[in-house]
A protein has these predicted regions:
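Positively charged n-region of N-terminal signal peptides that target proteins for export
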Residues: 1-4
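Hydrophobic helical h-region of N-terminal Sec-dependent signal peptides
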Residues: 6-14
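Sec/Tat signal peptide C-region and signal peptidase I cleavage site
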Residues: 14-20
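Extracytoplasmic/periplasm-facing segments of secreted or lipoprotein envelope proteins
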Residues: 21-38, 86-113
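Envelope-exposed proteins and targeting segments
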Residues: 31-33, 54-56, 65-67, 102-104, ...
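Fold-core signature of tandem repeat domains
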Residues: 35-37, 58-60, 69, 108, ...
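Short nucleic-acid-contacting surface segments enriched for D/E, G, S/T with interspersed K/R
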Residues: 47-61, 117-134
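Mid-chain, structured segments of secreted extracytoplasmic proteins
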Residues: 56-97, 138-162
Length: 162
């Protein structure tokens, strides 16, 4: 009994490094450096990945929240910066401070939540806006309003591990 308690205590004191995981998924190009897992509401953010694919099998190797994606047909490998799942926001209106990270991709300042827009050309840096969430299925949708301009929201996401 005492040995079991010591083993549990040792495991708590010395956590193991996160073991890499490998996953086979089918992905499609979503937007600049983003891919969507076709069967799930999950986005994969890559770095300088030029693969334009539709429903292609990939091997995803993850270590924590980062990793790499190997395309089955070309065998090209792209670094994965992050993986995002749906955020869980509820229908309603929210005052938020927004920063544009890249085209159609905004971060809610102070939260680990990202907004995916459709053809939004607003350049914001910690700019106050109104996020109106009208649906929550498949990542959520609605609109994002800044100083009299509005953008269509096509998803609300948060970082996750596969």
């Amino acid at each position: 009994m005492r040995t079991a308690i010591l083993v549990v205590c040792a495991a708590c004191l010395f956590p193991q490094a996160i073991v890499a995981g490998e996953y086979k998924e089918v992905v499609s190009s979503y937007d600049n450096d983003f891919y969507k897992i076709d069967s799930k509401a999950i986005l994969i953010r890559t770095e300088n990945c030029l693969e334009d694919v539709q429903a292609q099998e990939v091997l995803i190797t993850m270590n924590g929240r980062a990793g790499e994606m190997t395309f089955s047909e070309s065998e090209n490998i792209c670094p994965i910066l992050a993986v995002y799942g749906t955020s869980g926001y509820r229908v309603g209106n929210y005052r938020v401070d927004i920063t544009r990270e890249e085209e159609n991709w905004y971060n809610i300042f102070g939260q680990d939540i990202y907004i995916r827009t459709d053809n939004c050309l607003i350049y914001a840096t910690e700019q106050e806006g109104l996020l109106s969430v009208s649906t929550v299925g498949k990542g959520g949708s609605g609109s994002l309003h800044f100083e009299g301009e509005a953008c269509r929201v096509i998803g609300l996401y948060k970082p996750m591990e596969l």
